[in-house]
Regions:
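Residues that flank catalytic or metal-binding motifs in active/ligand-binding sites
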Residues: 104, 155, 165
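Short conserved AdoMet
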Residues: 57, 146, 164
Length: 196
């Protein structure tokens, strides 16, 4: 018997074995990336992240301690900063725009369990973060969310729904608290230091 109550038959055993081997390979890759996250050189970490499938540019920065799930589903734009100890989930695609500043300890998920289902199956939803977004420390972004251009997410906020352009959201769950008073978003976040 399989763990969710379905019988294992001769017909479906080979695909299950292959799927399990793929899962083990992914888990091994994620374990290696966890260790890579603590290499003190930004450039060496980026090389390993790129080799694991993360689509990122030379001008983006991922600080130490970042963790990933399904790196091949993650795209990071130009001049974007990912802070220390962030978690990035690529199971249903995670697209992060250019000039985005994601502070430390931010969690971005695009998969969660259906708590109303008897089988507790996964529910996937891609996450899109547009250009010039700032996400404060320890914020949580949940599956299926789009964060509009120039939006600001306050520290500790839990984002459960789409956020329009240039709005400031805070709280649990996050709600609009202000509009961002800026007309022309054209700043650069700066270059990373060698050992960041």
């Amino acid at each position: 018997m399989q763990h969710i109550g379905q019988k294992v038959t001769a017909k479906n055993i080979l695909p299950k074995i292959i799927n399990r081997l793929k899962t083990i390979a992914l888990e091994f890759c994620l374990m290696i990336l966890r260790y890579v996250g603590y290499i003190p050189s930004h450039l060496i970490r980026k090389f390993f992240y790129y080799m694991s499938g993360v689509n990122l540019t030379l001008t983006s920065t991922i600080h130490t301690g970042a963790q990933f799930f399904k790196p091949s589903g993650i795209t990071i734009g130009t001049d974007t900063i990912i802070g220390k100890n962030c978690f990035l989930d690529g199971r249903a695609s995670l697209s992060i725009g250019s000039h985005v500043d994601i502070a430390s300890d931010v969690l971005i998920y695009n998969d969660q369990h259906n708590i109303h289902s008897s089988t507790f199956e996964n529910q996937y939803g891609p996450v899109t973060i547009r250009d010039y977004v700032f996400i404060g420390p320890r914020a949580i972004i949940l599956p299926g969310v789009t964060i509009g251009k120039g939006a600001v997410i306050a520290a500790g906020a839990v984002v459960t729904k789409d956020i329009p352009d240039k709005q400031v959201w805070a709280g649990v769950p996050a709600k609009k608290i202000a509009d961002r008073k800026i007309d022309n978003l054209n700043y650069r976040l700066g270059r990373p230091t060698l050992f960041q």
